[in-house]
């Protein structure tokens, strides 16, 4: 079975093979764009890596330079920080909940507050990683996840 690559659009000024990014989701300003379906072909909160930059360029009112390139992307394994719990086991399906932490200088804040994930996303715990040092004293673990 042949698997077709995922296609999206990304600003021409940053379109390079190997670039990793998190798709933050669709923007309201893009609602009238003729190629928006290609841009929004990705899942909000998922991490991707550009595997190929194609020559096709399209106009864009959002990106600096007003141009976007067509790119092929692959989805990457993602990591989040969760509170330690007996429910957190490899293979378990969990619902992601933001910690809503206000410790803004913490280097882990994005992985604890889950800024880029849809609320209440269901994921499978692929593996349990290292303990995270939480400045607020929570017992946190880094977990690798796959999307359900």
Swiss-Prot record:
HAMAP family: UPF0179. Belongs to the UPF0179 family. This is UPF0179 protein Ta1159. NCBIfam families: PRK01177.1. Pfam families: UPF0179. The lineage of its organism: Archaea, Methanobacteriati, Thermoplasmatota, Thermoplasmata, Thermoplasmatales. It comes from Thermoplasma acidophilum (strain ATCC 25905 / DSM 1728 / JCM 9062 / NBRC 15155 / AMRC-C165).
